[in-house]
Amino acid sequence: MTVPRNRPMAPFGTIIKSRIKQPQFYWFIGHFLTIFNFIQFHLSITSKQNQLSCYRRSLFYISVTYAIVLYQFFKSDQLKFNFTLLRQEMKKLDNLQYFAMLFILFLLSQFNIIISGSLYSPVIFSIFHFLNYFKENLLPFLPLIPLNLKNLLNSKITVFIQNYNGFFLQMAQVFEIICGLRVGLFLVPFNFFLLLVRRANVSFEVVGTMLAGLTYVWFFKLRYLQSESMRQIFKQYVLRLDAYVSRTLPPYCSRLWNGYKNFVMTVFWKIPV
């Protein structure tokens, strides 16, 4: 919305004082800190410890944003924390699905466990939530910024959201599919193999990675069952993978791949949700 020219504006300090009384403001701050730490995560490629710290903080802040949304649902009686109904709620509430997955990964990250790619889709959502809140609730009241610049920023943000929201939502699903395939086809089976081989001397890193991987696969199944568009995109990626294997590898490799893929899918459908 364009910033009005003649309507008197409350001082920015007054606006902030009113905003900090609202849960949505902390939701906004959580999205900002998520984006900031996600950027720091990618800038810290030379330090594994710094990356781990940024990963933990990103998971924490984005979990807080989902917790705030769930709290709002709870206050308005849209969500009841009844353990007998939790399974049904988990199947239909995407906010609950994301919170559960992210919070479990946050807990496991305290033991140096990272699931690469798990942050991409939540961060995409954070970018759009951050921009929309900033445009509607803070930009009109910012001091020392000319009105024409505020209107320009408002217009640019509005156009970006309108033109790219659908595209980036689809990209978020693509990232979840890529992460789900990588974790389900390789990470979980590999760590399960290590678990069997090193039963007497298995490290917590293997167990933790296994738990984190299963958490993401469980989350992915919930998203897969709930979203028709994700099912369609998933089928396209599996078909591309099948075509690549049959086109570039010997026939026996294609048979092995199909057998392995069918085995993984059988296990996938047995995962309880």
Curated annotation (Swiss-Prot):
InterPro entries: PER33/POM33_regulator (IPR051645), TMEM33/Pom33 (IPR005344)
Broad class of the protein's primary localization: endoplasmic reticulum
UniProt superkingdom: Eukaryota
Localisation per UniProt entry: Endoplasmic reticulum membrane; Nucleus, Nuclear pore complex
Transmembrane segment boundaries: 25-45, 57-74, 99-119, 127-147, 177-197, 200-220
Keywords: Endoplasmic reticulum, Membrane, mRNA transport, Nuclear pore complex, Nucleus, Protein transport, Translocation, Transmembrane, Transmembrane helix, Transport
Cytoplasmic side: 1-24, 75-98, 148-176, 221-273
Note: Present with 2240 molecules/cell in log phase SD medium.
Protein name in the entry: Pore and endoplasmic reticulum protein of 33 kDa
Gene designation: PER33
